Structure formats: structure tokens, C-alpha cells
């Protein structure tokens, strides 16, 4: 569940030049991710705040939208313009948007 004030955008509607922060766990990332995304697992976001790209906005994604919603709320509280990617990587993959894998297999969302 997201805050009514938290901006959301469906994965299928993200602009081609969107700056994306993927907050999934390393095994999820390895199985399939957006090539240009920055990967910082949710448990490391606070400690790695300085590693988050400067972008207005930054789009935050996870598997289905729950973890990314929490991170988006946190980033917004830090003064960072964050947009939650509604539906997450599941919707990204379902809409046919490109993904890459670090496993040597076809990319997938796990």
C-alpha cells in the first residue's frame, strides 16, 4: 500500500531516459534487471544514500511495488524527488520492456 501523496507511474509508461533505482535483493537483480538501472538493495538504501543518482525524479522499482513504495517514501522524506514504479519488475517484464541477466540465462523476474 502506498501513501496517497506518493507519486506512482506504471512501468510501461516510464520515459526511455528514466533514472531507475532497483531495490531488490542481489539474487533477484542477477536473474533479470533493467540494464541502466542502479542497484541498491532495500536494506542498504540508508547507508548508501550518497550512491543514489541525482535525478529529478528518480524512479524506484522492486518486484511488485511494495518495497519500492517504502523506499520512495523514505527518499521523499530526505528531499529527493522519488516516483514509485507501480507493478514493479513484474509489470516491466509483462509489458515487454528490455531486461538483462547476470546468470547466463534468459532474464526473468523472480
Annotated model-derived regions:
Residues 61:
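Short, surface-exposed ligand- or partner-binding patches at beta-edge/loop junctions that are enriched
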Amino acid at each position: 500500500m502506498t501513501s496517497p501523496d506518493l507519486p506512482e507511474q506504471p512501468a510501461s509508461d516510464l520515459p526511455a531516459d528514466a533514472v531507475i533505482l532497483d531495490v531488490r535483493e542481489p539474487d533477484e537483480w542477477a536473474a533479470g534487471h533493467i540494464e541502466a538501472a542502479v542497484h541498491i538493495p532495500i536494506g542498504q538504501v540508508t547507508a548508501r544514500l550518497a550512491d543514489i543518482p541525482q535525478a529529478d525524479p528518480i524512479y524506484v522499482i522492486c518486484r511488485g511495488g511494495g518495497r519500492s513504495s517504502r523506499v520512495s517514501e523514505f527518499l521523499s522524506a530526505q528531499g529527493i524527488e522519488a516516483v514509485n514504479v507501480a507493478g514493479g519488475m513484474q509489470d516491466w517484464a509483462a509489458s515487454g520492456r528490455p531486461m538483462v541477466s547476470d546468470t547466463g540465462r534468459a532474464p526473468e523476474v523472480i
